[in-house]
Amino acid sequence: IKQFTLSQNFDEFHCAGDFQYEGGNSWGCPDEILFKYVEKYIAEEKDERTFHIILTTSNHPPYNIDVVAKGFPKEEIKQKLPDSLGSDEETLNEMGHIWYADQSMGNFIEKVEADKPDTLFVITGDHAERFDFSKEVDLKTLSVVPCIFYGKNVDKDLLADNKVGCHLQIISTLAEMVGQKGDTYSSIWPSLFDYNGIVFNHRLWTDTEKILSLIHI
């Protein structure tokens, strides 16, 4: 990742090996530790305009964080789960790590937003379809990855509710959101503002009306 990141003209690359922390796993450090180091960096560069890509890993196996100690209300959640979902320890632990990842990111956003109110956040995931307890759902719910643009000047009606896109459109969309009149940029795909056609991955395609499989057996 480091070699690729620096080849894309980023000025710096930091990984778990640069931080001091306890716990974590082969994927990296716990999310809350990662975010604290990013907070520190942003605070030190408060007068600079900086662009950060942050890769979190705590909602990834082996799920070895003590999420109950972090505040995950396991017993309360267990009582509220529908019959269609399992309530075994493995499932609850997996849910707890999703909760932990969400809490860590939410706390980070609140802190940075308070210190730098003009910050624009983009939140997305690299894939879906990996959570064992969420298979009894429709294809869209199971497969679609959300992408959230959040900031004080981001209008909730900026994009249509049924808008679809792909990760390759994030940078071009950001360029149009933060750029000045007359700015130009190069991109493989147009922004989410300019394209309303079909998007696809290795097994699915979708438009604003439907999602279908590319594989017919």
What does each model-identified segment do?
Residues 1-214:
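Solvent-exposed soluble domains appended to multi-pass membrane proteins
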